[in-house]
Amino acid sequence: MSKFFDDAVIFTDIHFGLKNNSKQHNNDCLNFIKWMIVQAHKRNIKKCFFLGDWHHHRATINVSTLNYTVDALQLLNDNFDEVQMIMGNHDLYYREKRDINSLPFANKYPNINIINDEIFEEDGVAFVPWLVDDEWKRLKELKSKFIFGHFELPDFYLNAMIKMPDHGGLKASDMSKAEKVFSGHFHKRQDKGNIIYPGNCFPHNYSDAWDDDRGITFLNWDGTYDFETWPDAPKYRVANLSQLLDDAGSILTNNTHCRIILDINISYEEANYIKETFATDYNLREISLMPSKKDNVSGEDWDTDGDVSVENVDSIVLSQLEAITSNSIRNETLISIYNDLHI
């Protein structure tokens, strides 16, 4: 069998434009790509595979975000001999068809190939765009050593809490002939059998709290692979105040977003002092204090500066969304939309 590659670097689900086209997030995306290129060059890797969801918003591309995209694509084009880019569901204007995507100009870069129109098979590999209609049935016929795609497989986790239900359609067993299957779409790193979800580039929100196993994947033709985590990635943490005061260094690091649950009584002045001190000492991106119970507020105006919320709002909302039973509404889609509301 001919070899499509000797070794390659893989990344997925970067989501340019997330958090209302946040400049901070887009800078994170660009800096991640610069870091990835450095790591690939250290190993003399010339091929790069992207497994879907370059942009976050399907209907519109913000002008600022577009400029970040152009810079990032130029970096990929200039630093790799070949870049295969799969279109994920977030890259498509319509979820159920692929005739319009948000990267129509990417093929203008000579070293970048967009995988959107159909399954691309060559020399022992298959690149599969977001599947529509009954295209999933074709995957049983693939005889490639490696399959790369953006698959929504049942019994894998969307995040630490939510497992993808079985809606019929594609299953992991449909790709059992492949030695390895690498997929974007689910942001949590996980594997089962020959299926590997390497995880997205870096944590995006509090559903990723304490889960930093994301970044890039190095794959060799012999099937061996290893992961590398971006050291400057943003992190998300949720912890009790008592834990924070006891061992802040194990919880807080540079670029951390954190929610601190007030499991001990403190005054409003003490709360402000804690926030200001830890934010400065650890170069935090965000710190918010959350009463563990509503009655812990004790009449004090905890919401004066907008940084403190009632207990477990996220878990309450997520549990309600997860409990919805409907033939026409996907719980995981609602959960994803809710998670993306956090800025």
Question: Positions of the model-derived regions?
Answer:
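Core catalytic region of metal-dependent phosphoesterases/phosphodiesterases
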Residues: 2-7, 14, 18-119, 174-178
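Beta-strand-turn-beta hairpins that frame and shape the catalytic cleft
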Residues: 2-9, 119-127, 142-146, 194-195, ...
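Divalent metal-coordination and catalytic microenvironments
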Residues: 13, 33, 48, 53, ...
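Active-site environment of divalent metal-dependent phosphoester hydrolases
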Residues: 15-19, 56-59, 86-97, 132-135, ...
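Accessory, non-catalytic peripheral segments of nucleic-acid enzymes
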Residues: 42, 220-343
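Conserved catalytic scaffold of divalent metal-dependent phosphoesterases
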Residues: 69, 87, 91-173, 201, ...
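Short, conserved loop/helix-junction motifs that constitute active-site signature segments
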Residues: 76-79, 140-143, 172-177, 251-254
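Conserved beta-sheet core of the metallophosphoesterase superfamily
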Residues: 160-225
